Amino acid sequence: NQIKLIARKTYDPKTGLFYHGWDESKTQNWANKETGCSPNFWSRSIGWYAAAVVDVLDYMPAQFEGRDSIMTIINTLAEGIVKYQEPETGVWWQVTDQNNRKGNYLESSASSLFVYFLCKAVNKGYIPVEYKAAAERGFNGLIKQFIKEEPDGSYTITNCCAVAGLGGKGNRDGSFAYYIGE
């Protein structure tokens, strides 16, 4: 039920994306007073949701009553995620729909989650095989854009947002400025 609730409350049909958060009471400083949604699409929040949704099906029997709804959500997620894949690099932006906006940056953890989601969903047959090309572009982009070999031969993943959230201490207001500052 939580998966369907979040899809119903955070999905934006104009962009095909899911907002970072939703406040039922619509009282949080970041919440839209009409919808309760946060003001932006943070890629890592979408990535965590996508990974969770695709993983849940591993524990859900094929005849489970709500399985078709989950499959619809997975296909909706795939469509939205691929729509915002950066064409040159194959990875995704920190603020998903704000490509090339000054200050926005290509972000590794969200891109990794999106690649995981797309690969698993294709491999399990949850989404059409045509999404495999986007998953491969994303994987190759991860390697080219974010993996750095250190002088000692170890590897580092770069361009990872340290932390972001909504509400609480400080000005965690979900604004574009907040996300690019993290």
What are these model-derived regions, one by one?
Residues 34-48, 66-73, 106:
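Short, contiguous, pocket-lining structural segments
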